[in-house]
Amino acid sequence: MTPSELMPREKLLTYGANALTDQELLAIFLRTGIKGLPVMQLANQVLTTFGSLRALLTADLNAFCQIKGLGQTQFIQLQASKEMTKRYLAQQMQMCETINTPHLAIMYFQTELEFEEREVFMVLFLDNQNRLIKKEKMFYGTINQATVHPREIIKEALKCNAAAIIVAHNHPSGNCTASQADRQLTQKIKAACHLVEVRFVDHIIVGKGSYFSFEEERFHQNN
Protein backbone atom coordinates (compact mmCIF):
# COMPACT_ATOMS: atom_id res chain seq x y z
CA MET A 1 0.00 0.00 0.00
CA THR A 2 1.41 3.39 -1.00
CA PRO A 3 1.53 6.36 1.43
CA SER A 4 -1.33 8.09 -0.42
CA GLU A 5 -3.59 5.07 0.16
CA LEU A 6 -3.08 5.04 3.93
CA MET A 7 -5.34 6.82 6.39
CA PRO A 8 -3.58 9.64 8.30
CA ARG A 9 -3.09 7.71 11.55
CA GLU A 10 -1.72 4.63 9.80
CA LYS A 11 0.47 6.82 7.61
CA LEU A 12 1.90 8.54 10.69
CA LEU A 13 2.70 5.22 12.36
CA THR A 14 4.32 3.87 9.20
CA TYR A 15 6.22 6.88 7.89
CA GLY A 16 6.33 9.38 10.76
CA ALA A 17 4.50 12.66 11.34
CA ASN A 18 6.68 14.64 8.92
CA ALA A 19 5.29 12.56 6.02
CA LEU A 20 1.78 13.92 6.57
CA THR A 21 0.21 16.88 4.82
CA ASP A 22 -1.29 19.77 6.79
CA GLN A 23 -4.73 18.37 6.00
CA GLU A 24 -3.81 14.93 7.36
CA LEU A 25 -2.27 16.35 10.54
CA LEU A 26 -5.36 18.44 11.15
CA ALA A 27 -7.62 15.44 10.51
CA ILE A 28 -5.78 13.52 13.23
CA PHE A 29 -6.16 16.47 15.58
CA LEU A 30 -9.90 16.78 14.85
CA ARG A 31 -10.36 12.99 15.22
CA THR A 32 -13.89 12.92 13.76
CA GLY A 33 -15.88 14.77 11.17
CA ILE A 34 -19.42 16.09 11.45
CA LYS A 35 -22.68 14.87 9.96
CA GLY A 36 -22.32 14.73 6.20
CA LEU A 37 -18.66 15.72 6.29
CA PRO A 38 -15.92 13.11 6.93
CA VAL A 39 -12.93 14.25 8.94
CA MET A 40 -10.59 14.64 5.94
CA GLN A 41 -13.13 16.85 4.18
CA LEU A 42 -13.68 18.84 7.37
CA ALA A 43 -9.92 19.35 7.71
CA ASN A 44 -9.73 20.56 4.11
CA GLN A 45 -12.64 22.95 4.68
CA VAL A 46 -10.99 24.39 7.80
CA LEU A 47 -7.67 24.96 6.02
CA THR A 48 -9.44 26.51 3.02
CA THR A 49 -11.37 28.86 5.30
CA PHE A 50 -8.32 30.03 7.24
CA GLY A 51 -5.97 29.91 4.27
CA SER A 52 -3.13 28.10 6.04
CA LEU A 53 -2.21 26.05 9.07
CA ARG A 54 -0.38 29.08 10.47
CA ALA A 55 -3.52 31.21 10.26
CA LEU A 56 -5.49 28.50 12.05
CA LEU A 57 -2.89 28.32 14.81
CA THR A 58 -3.06 32.08 15.36
CA ALA A 59 -6.85 32.41 15.25
CA ASP A 60 -8.60 33.68 18.36
CA LEU A 61 -11.41 31.76 20.05
CA ASN A 62 -14.17 33.67 18.29
CA ALA A 63 -12.77 33.14 14.79
CA PHE A 64 -11.93 29.51 15.57
CA CYS A 65 -15.47 28.70 16.69
CA GLN A 66 -17.05 30.26 13.61
CA ILE A 67 -16.26 27.04 11.74
CA LYS A 68 -18.85 24.31 12.10
CA GLY A 69 -17.16 21.35 13.76
CA LEU A 70 -14.73 23.47 15.76
CA GLY A 71 -15.44 24.56 19.31
CA GLN A 72 -13.96 25.60 22.61
CA THR A 73 -12.65 22.11 23.38
CA GLN A 74 -10.61 21.92 20.17
CA PHE A 75 -9.38 25.48 20.70
CA ILE A 76 -8.13 24.62 24.19
CA GLN A 77 -6.43 21.47 22.90
CA LEU A 78 -4.73 23.42 20.12
CA GLN A 79 -3.43 26.09 22.49
CA ALA A 80 -2.13 23.38 24.83
CA SER A 81 -0.34 21.70 21.91
CA LYS A 82 1.32 24.99 20.92
CA GLU A 83 2.47 25.60 24.48
CA MET A 84 3.88 22.08 24.79
CA THR A 85 5.92 22.69 21.64
CA LYS A 86 7.33 25.91 23.11
CA ARG A 87 8.23 24.20 26.36
CA TYR A 88 9.79 21.24 24.56
CA LEU A 89 12.12 23.53 22.61
CA ALA A 90 12.93 25.53 25.74
CA GLN A 91 13.82 22.33 27.61
CA GLN A 92 15.87 21.10 24.65
CA MET A 93 17.96 24.27 24.84
CA GLN A 94 18.25 23.96 28.61
CA MET A 95 19.47 20.36 28.28
CA CYS A 96 21.95 21.06 25.49
CA GLU A 97 25.54 21.01 26.65
CA THR A 98 26.25 23.91 24.31
CA ILE A 99 24.48 26.03 21.70
CA ASN A 100 27.35 26.04 19.21
CA THR A 101 25.10 26.77 16.25
CA PRO A 102 22.13 29.12 16.28
CA HIS A 103 19.70 26.67 14.65
CA LEU A 104 18.14 25.43 17.89
CA ALA A 105 17.84 29.02 19.07
CA ILE A 106 16.25 29.99 15.74
CA MET A 107 13.65 27.22 16.09
CA TYR A 108 12.88 28.40 19.60
CA PHE A 109 12.63 32.06 18.59
CA GLN A 110 10.31 31.14 15.72
CA THR A 111 8.03 29.22 18.08
CA GLU A 112 8.00 32.06 20.60
CA LEU A 113 7.78 35.06 18.29
CA GLU A 114 6.30 34.11 14.92
CA PHE A 115 2.69 34.47 16.02
CA GLU A 116 3.08 37.66 18.05
CA GLU A 117 0.87 40.47 16.74
CA ARG A 118 3.28 43.20 17.90
CA GLU A 119 7.04 43.46 17.91
CA VAL A 120 8.71 41.60 20.77
CA PHE A 121 12.45 41.67 21.49
CA MET A 122 13.86 38.57 23.18
CA VAL A 123 17.28 37.63 24.53
CA LEU A 124 18.98 34.32 25.31
CA PHE A 125 21.73 34.65 27.93
CA LEU A 126 24.53 32.06 27.68
CA ASP A 127 27.44 31.08 29.90
CA ASN A 128 31.06 30.81 28.75
CA GLN A 129 30.39 27.32 27.35
CA ASN A 130 27.36 28.51 25.36
CA ARG A 131 24.89 26.88 27.75
CA LEU A 132 21.59 28.63 28.33
CA ILE A 133 21.39 30.58 31.60
CA LYS A 134 18.03 32.23 31.01
CA LYS A 135 15.72 33.57 28.33
CA GLU A 136 13.69 36.75 28.53
CA LYS A 137 11.30 38.82 26.45
CA MET A 138 12.68 42.23 27.31
CA PHE A 139 10.93 44.79 25.13
CA TYR A 140 7.44 45.03 23.66
CA GLY A 141 6.34 47.41 20.94
CA THR A 142 3.68 48.14 18.36
CA ILE A 143 2.82 46.31 15.16
CA ASN A 144 5.94 47.67 13.46
CA GLN A 145 8.36 48.91 16.11
CA ALA A 146 9.76 48.08 19.54
CA THR A 147 12.02 50.45 21.45
CA VAL A 148 15.11 48.52 22.53
CA HIS A 149 17.63 49.76 25.09
CA PRO A 150 21.05 48.06 24.71
CA ARG A 151 22.10 49.20 28.19
CA GLU A 152 19.21 47.21 29.71
CA ILE A 153 20.34 44.10 27.84
CA ILE A 154 23.89 44.54 29.12
CA LYS A 155 22.63 45.21 32.64
CA GLU A 156 20.71 41.92 32.59
CA ALA A 157 23.67 40.05 31.07
CA LEU A 158 25.97 41.23 33.86
CA LYS A 159 23.33 40.50 36.46
CA CYS A 160 23.14 36.82 35.44
CA ASN A 161 26.88 36.63 34.69
CA ALA A 162 26.30 35.84 31.02
CA ALA A 163 29.31 35.44 28.75
CA ALA A 164 27.31 35.67 25.51
CA ILE A 165 23.90 36.64 24.18
CA ILE A 166 21.67 35.82 21.21
CA VAL A 167 18.96 38.39 20.51
CA ALA A 168 15.86 38.23 18.33
CA HIS A 169 12.74 40.12 17.45
CA ASN A 170 9.79 39.51 15.16
CA HIS A 171 8.30 41.40 12.24
CA PRO A 172 4.51 41.03 12.57
CA SER A 173 4.20 41.93 8.87
CA GLY A 174 5.72 38.54 8.10
CA ASN A 175 8.62 40.01 6.12
CA CYS A 176 11.87 39.14 7.86
CA THR A 177 14.04 41.51 5.79
CA ALA A 178 16.33 43.55 8.03
CA SER A 179 15.58 47.28 7.99
CA GLN A 180 18.19 50.01 8.35
CA ALA A 181 16.96 50.51 11.92
CA ASP A 182 17.51 46.79 12.60
CA ARG A 183 21.08 47.05 11.32
CA GLN A 184 21.80 50.14 13.40
CA LEU A 185 20.38 48.47 16.50
CA THR A 186 22.53 45.39 15.90
CA GLN A 187 25.66 47.54 15.77
CA LYS A 188 24.68 49.35 18.98
CA ILE A 189 24.15 46.08 20.84
CA LYS A 190 27.42 44.69 19.48
CA ALA A 191 29.29 47.79 20.64
CA ALA A 192 27.71 47.63 24.09
CA CYS A 193 28.64 43.97 24.40
CA HIS A 194 32.22 44.69 23.36
CA LEU A 195 32.61 47.27 26.14
CA VAL A 196 31.84 44.72 28.86
CA GLU A 197 33.37 41.69 27.09
CA VAL A 198 30.07 39.91 26.53
CA ARG A 199 30.13 37.98 23.25
CA PHE A 200 27.43 38.91 20.74
CA VAL A 201 26.44 35.70 18.92
CA ASP A 202 23.64 36.74 16.59
CA HIS A 203 20.58 38.89 15.99
CA ILE A 204 17.71 36.97 14.43
CA ILE A 205 14.60 38.45 12.83
CA VAL A 206 11.55 36.19 12.77
CA GLY A 207 8.96 36.47 9.99
CA LYS A 208 6.08 34.23 8.99
CA GLY A 209 7.68 30.88 8.27
CA SER A 210 11.03 32.56 7.67
CA TYR A 211 13.91 34.20 9.48
CA PHE A 212 16.91 36.43 8.90
CA SER A 213 20.23 35.94 10.70
CA PHE A 214 22.84 38.71 10.79
CA GLU A 215 25.51 36.12 11.53
CA GLU A 216 24.51 34.01 8.52
CA GLU A 217 24.59 37.12 6.34
CA ARG A 218 28.08 37.99 7.62
CA PHE A 219 29.27 34.41 6.98
CA HIS A 220 28.00 34.39 3.39
CA GLN A 221 29.52 37.80 2.68
CA ASN A 222 32.93 36.57 3.86
CA ASN A 223 32.84 33.28 1.94
From Swiss-Prot:
Record's keyword terms, sorted: Hydrolase, Metal-binding, Metalloprotease, Protease, Zinc
GO-annotated biological processes: proteolysis
Record: residues binding Zn(2+): 169, 171, 182
GO MF entries: metal ion binding; metallopeptidase activity
Position of sequence motif JAMM motif: 169-182
Domain MPN: 98-220
UniProt xrefs under PROSITE patterns: MPN (PS50249), UPF0758 (PS01302)
InterPro entries: MPN (IPR037518), RadC_JAB (IPR025657), RuvA_2-like (IPR010994), UPF0758 (IPR001405), UPF0758_CS (IPR020891), UPF0758_N (IPR046778)
A Pfam family recorded for this sequence: RadC
Superkingdom of origin organism: Bacteria
Protease among keywords: yes
Protein family: Belongs to the UPF0758 family.
Listed name of the protein: UPF0758 protein HD_0732
